[in-house]
Structure formats: structure tokens, C-alpha cells
Amino acid sequence: MAKIEAHRVPGFGAFIRSFGCFSVRRGESDREAVRTMRRIVADGHALGLFVEGTRQRSGVPGSVQPGAAMVAIQEGAPIVPVAILGTQTWSPRHPTPVSIAWGEPLALEGVPKGGKGYKEASAQIEHEIRRLWDWLVALHEQGRPDGVSLPADRR
């Protein structure tokens, strides 16, 4: 799932659609996107999305929007939290290292359906993403061990 504007970028839009990416209208209730999300999850497929709703240019995790929690709770699916560090400075012209940490799946069983439950689940997801992000920051502060090169250095 990607913002509708990403689908309009020449070349990129066709690329992301080629592997099943669909659009979402941000800042409003996009019922068609929610139906698509629910269908994908109900069919047993993985659904990738940025639960914050956008890339965080500040470099720190943002607030988790309730849509992912809502779909996970309604469909009985787990959420796999992911923290990404380094995208705030990355660009195609100036690529920089980006680190990704995957957490354990969060089962949201027992969390009630409805606004209060979705907020509670979103807070759990946000807490876990922040924990993973803090871990990535700590790893970066330690630096790379001697003798270990980045893949780009090996070309």
C-alpha cells in the first residue's frame, strides 16, 4: 500500500503496482483501501504498510495511525513491527545506509474491536517500534566493527 501520489510517479507507479501495491488516499477515510487491506489479510497474505502513514523526515518514529491495528484486530492477524533508521537523509542521488529491525509478531487477540481497542493496539505497536528503533540507534552509536565493510564498499 502506498499513497496515491506515489502511483502517479512515472515508472515508479508501474513498478510498485507490478508487485500488488495499491493506493490509499491519506488524510481521509479511504474505505476502498480498508476493504482491500482486509481482503488481503483475510486471504492469508502479508500486507506491508507504514503504520505511521508516512516517512518520518525527523528521523524518529512518529505516531502510529489506527488503520493497521483495526484491520489486524478485525481479521485476527498479527502485526510484525518494523523499525527503520536512516531514511530521513536517504535519496536516490545521495544514498545513505539504512538499517531495519524486525520484531516478533504482536498478537492482538483480546483487544476489543472499536476505537478504544484500535488506539490501545496502536499504542502497543508504537511502543514496540520505538523499542526496536532505540536498539538500532544504540547499534549505530557503537559503530561498525573493524574489518566489516558495507555492501556498497565491496563493489
What are these regions (language model features)?
Residues 1-29, 35-36:
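Catalytic core of membrane glycerolipid acyltransferases/transacylases, capturing the structured
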Residues 32-155:
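Non-catalytic C-terminal accessory region of glycerolipid acyltransferases
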